[in-house]
């Protein structure tokens, strides 16, 4: 029925033409009032090429432009001269002014064109909003796609009840979608991508039952995907890329049986199972990327006969690839990248010529590994197999982390790549290697020197171009001197619609500076349609997210301007990994329809240490002869004697080199110069393993120097752990390790210098002058910063670490009072995430969790307990171990529980704040702190849950209603006090008798035996 009026219109139009009523005689000119309206419109839009010497309805002059060079350009006015009586005037029914660089505000005078039904002003630079005068118009099709309109959703549009197609894509509208949009019941197409709309989707959208095409990608909506989408039973296309909504995808989606194109990506919320899509038999494009989908891939996916593009990448899918996938004969693209799929890779995936990507998975069937190299396989299988330490056949590029099989003498220590372009020599010493492979939909390319590689995933959909380009040439004006050696690096770039990963292969282990070179060379800064585009993507280094929603133009403050992002990276397994991923943000219709994903111009990797030098012994003998050989032998004898005398002093050097650590960034001479030979006036603290000094390098950079005490071998080993593992951890809330110095038995770590010392000094320093006046917002920021740092250590980093000594003095504050966790010298690796027994208790009285201090049970929940104590100190401004309101209380924590039982927790808030704090936030933070100090580790929250609670993403009410989170069993309090006052006062270290193991269940058993769960 919705198309009957169109059919009727066509029949009438044909009849009128047949009877000669559309001829342009003198009596069939455009109505004079509409001519005046067009003149006003043209003046406001700067449309100077309209020739009013010709009648706008004559089809002559500039009123209909049939030849143009710009893609998407259109300049046409369509009239209807069939109105009765026969000699009446013509009227404008359609105006299309597309891609014409029009500027200014939207003219209200369009409302004077009473018969206008179609208005297309897409891809211009119009500003402001929609005039209220438009409320009386009878528009059916309206497009402002790709302009600069702003403000809230124009309510005047909800008055245009005849609208069938509405596009506001690619503008700057903000705020919620008004409920009045439900009045547009005739809408068939609604395009709202690439704006800044917020709030939940109004349920009134469910009234738009005639929708066939709905797009809301690249916005900031909140809440879940609503169930009312099941009302859109006629919908053919539904796109929700990076729109801010949470999962799960509702089961009601199964009723949308007409869908041919479903695209959803980057959902928030909790993981959920695969949505029921079996009824979507007409589906051609199915994209469910990064939607937190867990579990197996349903078998019926392979039976969807019309499916051409399938993208299930970057989810949590597990199990084997269904055998039904062999039936997907018509599929052009299959992306299963970045999941946890196991089993084997089917032969039909490896052998087919279509684009298939199963990289970054956990396949275990060794027999399905191709016998030849990754770049000779049609499909992309990079890092797709998880075989552990098992022997394997074929190339190592198929294995996770690409293990290096070359001896040390062949390791690489510098790397330069000109991404998307040819070889560029910037000086005598540095040449950027060519990276100009044109293909890229699903590929692996090995560099010319076989020491770097790239993996690309994704095809440029919707651009109507069969020959997608994955390397691009500069189209903007470069702000780089053409005579500059680096000019050639920014003339080209490599792009990818979805995922782009670069590898440094067989690098020597150690600390490196990685420079990523960017310049936006597609979008421009002028008023052309190329200035309307927006590119956003995420940057990962060593699989860790380092920049979210990176915008090259914004970072460089313009197009064509170079910007270099530098990262200190510790390579520990000979592989460097740099990942760029599109996260559904940015424009997809400007300047032309398509995806504008990651872009990179060049990569440089340089060591922060002196690489070892290896010589070919045969060549030396041939060139220098026997005399030199004799001298060399004598030298070896002398060195041998010298080594024998000093072998005890070099034990740590040997230990470090045995671990293949190359972190000798600083010399002892540099360190002594920076610290005035460790002058006592430079001393700023005393750590668990030695003193800490403030230093200043020759270039003026401030550093913190930690000089390791040589009192014990245990300390030496901990130092090795710090160098080898902690420098690989980079997070805004962790103290950054710059490098180390290893000379003889001098073991020194060099950290970033933090201006505001530690949290304990800021809160309760010895004298008032050393304390900082921390307002409430700063305390909350510190609270959240510590929580985020621990979340990273426990859950997000590649190597899981339990700190074991979280306390206020191990939290440092930078110049902006951001919290950074320090002192990982006591950290223990927890690779498999299981509970384990520690044979050495390391921690501080008053901060240690009972199960760890008493039994040696160590999990990340020990850090959670310590965090809870520090959290109380942040809110109260009092030290847990030094504050005793009466003799009945040993710790601040005990007093906190008493106040909680009395219902007067807010008495804990630091009195120096007076009333300048949020009572609601204080109650939340205090209750979270007490939850963290629950005597039972199984009842403590994880640190990610703490972050979610404080950020308001998770409600607190249900947890607070559980007595186990809000009260303390007297038996537990007595047990804890007894332990602190007696057992810990004797010793902080003990050995367990014989080998012991523990699991989550045994931990609970232990709690029951000690009365922790009574």
Curated annotation (Swiss-Prot):
Residue intervals on the Cytoplasmic side: 641-1014
Catalytic activity: L-seryl-[protein] + ATP = O-phospho-L-seryl-[protein] + ADP + H(+); L-threonyl-[protein] + ATP = O-phospho-L-threonyl-[protein] + ADP + H(+)
Binding annotation for ATP: 684-692, 706
Ranges where the record places region Disordered: 989-1014
Matches recorded under InterPro entries: Kinase-like_dom_sf, Leu-rich_rpt, Leu-rich_rpt_typical-subtyp, LRR_dom_sf, LRR_Rcpt-Like_S/T_Kinase, Malectin_dom, Prot_kinase_dom, Protein_kinase_ATP_BS
Enzyme Commission number(s) from the entry: 2.7.11.1
Residues annotated with Phosphoserine modification: 809, 838, 989
Biased composition (Polar residues): 989-1002
Extracellular topology ranges: 24-619
Claim: Manganese is one of the keywords in the record: no
Signal peptide, first to last residue: 1-23
Protein name: Probable LRR receptor-like serine/threonine-protein kinase At1g07650
Source organism of the structure: Arabidopsis thaliana (Mouse-ear cress)
